[in-house]
Amino acid sequence: MKVNVLLAVFLVVMVVTDHCHALFGLIPSMMGGLVSAFKGRRKLQMEARFQPQNKNYRKRELDLENLFTHMPDY
């Protein structure tokens, strides 16, 4: 009887440990998502501050990003 109880307790501990490990692995990725969301919002605020003569630089930067995304990786 003791062996059955010990086996059940061991399995419960293993399941709880696995779930805790998954949760603690999820927390850093959630923090990264929050940081990128705030950076994106800050980027939009900075773009609103650009003067019209400087907006052309941002367009060129986007064109280069578009060009690089379509280039094959060597």
From Swiss-Prot:
Segment forming the signal sequence: 1-22
Protein origin, superkingdom: Eukaryota
Residue stretch(es) of the prosequence: 44-74
GO biological process assignments: defense response to bacterium
Tissues in which the UniProt entry reports expression: Expressed by the venom gland.
GO cellular component, as recorded: extracellular region; membrane; other organism cell membrane
Cell location: Secreted; Target cell membrane
Coiled coil, from the record: none
The entry's keywords: Amidation, Antibiotic, Antimicrobial, Cleavage on pair of basic residues, Membrane, Secreted, Signal, Target cell membrane, Target membrane, Transmembrane
Residue(s) carrying Lysine amide: 39
Function text: Cationic host defense peptide that have antibacterial activity by breaking membranes. Is more effective on Gram-positive than on Gram-negative bacteria.
Family: Belongs to the non-disulfide-bridged peptide (NDBP) superfamily. Short antimicrobial peptide (group 4) family.
Name of the protein in its database record: Antimicrobial peptide 36.4
Highest classification ranks of the organism: Eukaryota, Metazoa, Ecdysozoa, Arthropoda, Chelicerata
